[in-house]
Amino acid sequence: MSEENKKLTKSELKDLVKRKKKKKIILVSCISAGVILLALIIGLIIWQVTRIKPVKRTDEQGIVVGKIGEYEIYNDEFSYLLDIYKKNIEYKYGKIDWSDGSEFTKKCLDELEEDIIDGMMTNYAVFEVCKDHGIDADSREINKLVNEKIKEIIDDENGEFKGDKGKYVEYSRKGNESDAYIRIIAKAAVLEEKIIEKLRESGEIEYVLEKNLPEFITHAKESDTFVRTTHVFYPKFDVKGVDIEEVRAEASEIAANLKSISDDEDRYDAINKAISKCPYNTPGYTMANKDGIYFTEGMMGEVYESTARALDEYGTSDVIETDEGFYVIMRLPLDTDYVGKNAETLLENYSWAKLALLERGAKAELLSVCDDFSGLIYERLTK
């Protein structure tokens, strides 16, 4: 098996780190800029059954290349994200001559820098939220939980390494997938759980399953906290060979057709037919189904959320563009029976959406104190 085929995606890593969580929130284009494909391999040493000693960065991995606020960005993290996002952009647009100085290449460089910075800020935004809420990110308890998560990943019989510490150590010292970077990601995952606990204790998350679920159900049914939608989705580059302009044109045709239908029921039937016919509306590409999507602020991308809230019931949007693709959205009325039957899931999503909003705000603050990485990106791409 090739080295490339051995790599885990960042989403797979987070699934492993968080697999005991009951988090069911779906993020389309927020935070993560949705989400988006990052590959990652984990390196560590298991010195004892219950104690895992970190693997030190190599000299090359440990070079500081910049800062985001107080957080030093090391060469391993920067180089890894540069490589992953460069591949994503070239998968989207085709092979790029990064030194040709064209307007197209400048646009791609800007997009690449934005993606890299967003990727770097994702974990540090969690640390900032911790500081704002009095959580010690470096406490013995947190470090113990991080060790447990990493050990769980290492010992996974279905994973790549299956407890082979030598294999972990060797891989963590090659390239840019260092143990230190993995620990940052694992710590962020652990801390998100702690932040949710703190928000519930403080009342910032006002509804708690064990205390006031009935009140939450009433709130969800009678307020505009939750919005229900369905949509047609066309990806930009998740399917090999997709022509972006062709996809945009197809989505625009659907949007225009829906807007030409005056009857609500006929329009609803039409979007469902469009969803069923769209080759990309498989479970891997869309969340749209007969129940629709129930979301509150912080769960979806900002563009998606604001567009949906501006629609009347059974109204449809123009084509909206996000990092991952094109959407045509229809707003649907809330189904109170659905809310009652799925209240626990909606409450869990509501709680995580509160955290997502805090992280979104922390990212905005970090962006204002972020170093300019454009020169370094260009240098690495053209050397």
Question: How would you name each of these model-derived features?
Answer:
Residues 18-26, 72, 80, 248-259, ...:
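Solvent-exposed loop/turn and edge beta-strand elements of beta-rich ligand-binding domains
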Residues 54-177:
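N-terminal targeting/tethering segments
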Residues 76, 107-124, 136-140, 181-190, ...:
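Soluble non-cytosolic domains of exported or imported proteins
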Residues 156, 289, 322:
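Acidic surface patches and DE-rich sequence motifs
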Residues 253-303, 333:
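Peptidyl-prolyl cis-trans isomerase
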Residues 82-89, 120, 124, 128-137, ...:
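Sec/Tat-exported extracytoplasmic proteins
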Residues 2-32, 41-60, 168-246, 298-383:
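PPIase-associated folding chaperone regions across multiple families
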